[in-house]
């Protein structure tokens, strides 16, 4: 069983979003960092943010609030979609006020009910959209969190591979 996601849009020839479109590349990059921030452990994210110096001021546009979303699945990844169940999420929206790029807004949705995690992720999303902070946040927050996630995936894959059973059928000499 897999969780349903939106299918990738086919490449457009009319100037729409595709792999060669810089806006599309920027959107994919933002999706990647938002995914890393949302999936990171709250404590790891807070530790990484603590290493950044002189963070700009920000105002909370939409305070962190908890809610639920319906998760949909497909049997075998190909069957008809069905409602798998509800999942708790927390969302937050902030706007930077202490930078030259004061109109920058950061968004975050995180699984669970951790309001501080959502606010921290929204702040990092906003900072990553600025020229002044992008490189530092990517180097000190995003890359280390991505490495932690990759290490966890490798460890989990190793544990799964260790329990793999290979079944085979032997054919007897009967006709």
Where are these regions (language model features)?
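Generic structural signal of hydrophobic/aromatic residues within well-ordered alpha-helices
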Residues: 33-36, 45-49, 123, 137-141, ...
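Charge-rich, low-complexity N-terminal segments
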Residues: 1-56
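Cysteine/selenocysteine-centered motifs that mediate thiol-based redox chemistry or coordinate metal-sulfur cofactors
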Residues: 129-175
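Structured beta-strand/loop patches that form or line metal/cofactor-binding pockets in enzymes
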Residues: 50-102, 108-110
């Amino acid at each position: 069983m897999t969780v349903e996601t939106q299918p990738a849009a086919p490449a457009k020839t009319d100037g729409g979003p595709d792999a060669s479109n810089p806006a599309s590349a920027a959107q994919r990059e933002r999706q990647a960092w938002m995914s890393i921030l949302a999936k990171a452990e709250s404590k790891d994210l807070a530790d990484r943010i603590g290493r950044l110096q002189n963070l700009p001021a920000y105002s909370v546009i939409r305070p962190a609030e908890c809610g639920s979303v319906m998760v949909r699945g497909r049997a075998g990844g190909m069957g008809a979609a069905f409602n798998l169940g509800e999942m708790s999420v927390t969302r937050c929206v902030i706007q930077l006020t202490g930078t030259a790029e004061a109109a920058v807004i950061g968004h975050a949705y995180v699984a669970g009910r951790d309001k501080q995690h959502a606010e921290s992720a929204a702040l990092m999303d906003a900072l990553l959209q600025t020229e002044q902070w992008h490189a530092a946040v990517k180097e000190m927050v995003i890359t280390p969190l991505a490495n932690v996630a990759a290490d966890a995936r490798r460890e989990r894959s190793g544990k799964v591979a260790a329990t793999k059973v290979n079944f085979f059928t032997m054919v007897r000499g009967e006709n």
